[in-house]
Structure formats: structure tokens, C-alpha cells
A protein has these predicted regions:
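Short, flexible loop/turn elements at secondary-structure junctions
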Residues: 12-14, 35, 70-72, 83-85, ...
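Compositionally biased, charged N-terminal/linker segments
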Residues: 1-58, 110
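A short, conserved, highly charged catalytic patch centered on acidic carboxylates
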Residues: 51, 61-62, 156-275, 283-318
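Long, low-complexity intrinsically disordered regions
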Residues: 123-157
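Short coil-to-beta transition motif at edge beta-strands of beta-rich domains
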Residues: 56-69
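Aromatic- and Lys/Arg-enriched surface recognition patch
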Residues: 74, 80-136
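Short secondary-structure boundary/capping segments
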Residues: 24-28, 83, 95, 264, ...
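Switch/connector loops and helix/strand junctions flanking conserved nucleotide-binding motifs
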Residues: 19, 76-78, 87-90, 113-118, ...
Length: 318
């Protein structure tokens, strides 16, 4: 057995805001916080909220085994480290997470998540760490030597290209974007602001102003119509036929992608296919009804990139 390989666990993100799919799709392992910049030997652990990034960059070696952890006791995939530490800015916004610290990892995704049955990674496992549980170490060592093992030599996929930043938002949206960027740091500061704003506040202060700036008049923007958080209408009266799309709002920083199923239920109740937007007031992800609700457009108002223009165009009043 490969007893010389260190066994690591790497979090795939919380259930409500997971990024495990990104790891498997791109044969990559990612870690944050990435916005403080590339790690190097002169950087302090304090710059990265602890020693996780330093250990990820320095102690992990090519050939080590990585378990893609989900929750306290499950794993989604087993991987083998295939590359040295890199800082990849194309992963600066993974479902809202800044995960630029990277290593290429060849993953073997399990048919179903493997449940160890107890909190083998600890009661509050860190985002990245070495594995100490004998049960888990034994599982990992046996897995990588058990056939099939061809996945450990598979060609690595090309990494996605970095999306260019948007130098200036469209003129109609400049005030809205500026206000969001001004308020965003404050809303996260519990000492200065207090409790995080509710979904209703985010709708009132961010979502509706964005729609107004995109040309929708107030009488054609409903709030809590048929339980839908926000719905713009192409014409009056407010009927399912005139509903342009369904917007489902979540609290700030929540996993907006996890709200898709709830929004799809609202669309089904309408009886007519409509695109869906899920948002926390800052991040907006659109799912296209014509593509079986596949993700089709995205914008992060505090990290605007050129593809955001597509989302703005889709949200404009026709």
C-alpha cells in the first residue's frame, strides 16, 4: 500500500453553497480566502485567517491523497494531487467564494457519497487539514490501490479561462452598483451594523432598485405575488401569462443556487415556463426555462465581470 502518501481532507463547501461540482468538473482543489493574494513564504498566516493556505501550498505534495469532504462525515470523491500550488484568479468567484488558491487533483467521483457514520473529521472540521482518523486513513489507502486505478493517470482537463473584469457598469446601473459596493462591507460588519439584513430588506434596497434601473416601472414589479419574492410583468394585469420571470431572494451570503428548486415550484404553479433568477441582492444567477433550468447568466455586483452584461440584458424590460 502507498503508506508514504499523506491523506488530506478538503471541504467542498457548505450544503447550501457547495462548490464540490467545480472541483470534480475541472480536476481542481480550491481553497480560500483568495482575495488577500498569492501565498508565498513571506506571508503571515494571519493574512489568510489561519494556517490552511500555507499548509495547502507547502505541505501537500504531488501524489498525496485528498478526500473531497461534504458535511461532517461524508465524502464525494477521492483524489490524487497532480500539481503544485497555483494562484488562479479565474476562481475568484465560485458561488460567491474567493477560492484562488489551487492545486490540480485527479478525482474519482463516487457513485454516491460515502458515509463514515460518525464525525470522523471532527465535530467542526476545518476547510482543509490532514486526516488523523485511522478508519479514514485506511479507507483512503485501500481505495487508491484498488482497481480500477486508471483515473490516477487520466489526462487533466484544460482550466477555464479567466473572465475579464467589467471596467464600468452600464450607465443606467452605475448608481445601483455603487450603492451596493458602498453598503456591502457594512452589512457584513455585525459590530457596526448589527444583524444581517433580512431577505425583504435586500429586495427593497437592492433587487427592486436594480429592476427599476433596468426599465421596469413600479406597477410592473410585484413583491410577494403568489408567494414569489419578486416578479416583473411585461404588461398589466398581473397574470401568469404576463409574468416575465421569477426572482427568488435569499439572505445575504446564502447559497442562492440552493433556492432553485423552490423557485421551480413557483414556476410550476404558474403553469407557464418562465426563467428564474436567484439572488441575495448582490449575486444574481439566471436559470433558463428553455434549457431545462440550466444556469445561463450570472452577475456579482461587487465583482463585476463582462459576462454580467448578458444577465443585465436578459433582465431589461423588453
Amino acid at each position: 500500500m502507498a503508506t508514504d502518501r499523506t491523506i488530506w481532507q478538503l471541504s467542498g463547501g457548505p450544503a447550501s453553497r457547495s462548490y464540490a461540482d467545480v472541483f470534480v468538473r475541472h480536476a481542481i482543489g480550491l481553497l480560500g480566502p483568495g482575495d488577500p493574494g498569492r501565498w508565498h513564504a513571506e506571508r503571515s498566516d494571519e493574512d489568510f485567517d489561519g494556517s490552511f493556505v500555507r499548509r495547502f501550498a507547502c505541505e501537500m505534495k504531488v501524489g498525496d491523497v485528498v478526500l473531497l469532504r461534504t458535511g461532517l462525515s461524508k465524502i464525494r470523491a477521492v483524489g490524487v494531487v497532480a500539481g503544485d500550488y497555483e494562484y488562479l484568479n479565474q476562481f475568484d468567484d465560485v458561488n460567491g467564494w474567493d477560492l484562488q488558491h489551487a492545486r490540480q487533483i485527479r478525482w474519482c467521483e463516487l457513485p454516491v457519497e460515502y458515509e463514515f457514520g460518525s464525525s470522523v473529521f471532527g465535530a467542526n472540521p476545518p476547510r482543509f487539514s490532514g486526516v488523523g482518523s485511522e478508519e479514514v486513513v485506511d479507507f483512503a489507502r485501500r481505495f487508491v490501490v484498488s482497481p480500477p486505478t486508471y483515473w490516477q493517470e487520466a489526462a487533466l482537463p484544460a482550466l477555464p479561462a479567466e473572465e475579464p473584469m467589467l471596467d464600468e457598469p452600464p450607465e443606467a446601473l452605475r448608481n445601483v452598483v455603487a450603492e451596493v459596493n458602498d453598503l456591502y462591507p457594512l452589512l457584513w460588519d455585525r459590530e457596526r451594523f448589527g444583524d444581517h439584513p433580512t431577505e425583504d430588506e435586500l429586495v427593497a434596497h437592492f433587487v427592486v432598485p436594480l429592476l427599476r434601473a433596468l426599465g421596469w416601472p413600479p406597477e410592473r414589479i410585484s413583491v410577494k405575488w403568489r408567494y414569489i419574492d419578486v416578479a416583473p410583468f411585461t404588461a398589466l394585469p398581473r397574470t401568469p401569462e404576463n409574468c416575465r420571470l421569477v426572482i427568488e431572494a435569499k439572505r445575504l451570503g446564502a447559497g442562492v443556487e440552493g433556492a432553485l428548486e423552490q423557485a421551480k415550484a413557483y414556476v410550476q404553479a404558474l403553469g407557464t415556463p418562465r426563467d428564474i433568477v436567484v439572488t441575495d441582492g448582490v449575486r444574481y444567477r439566471l436559470y433558463a426555462a428553455a434549457q431545462d433550468f440550466a444556469p445561463a447568466a450570472y452577475a456579482n455586483l461587487v465583482r463585476l465581470k463582462r459576462p454580467a452584461l448578458d444577465l443585465f440584458n436578459r433582465l431589461k424590460r423588453p
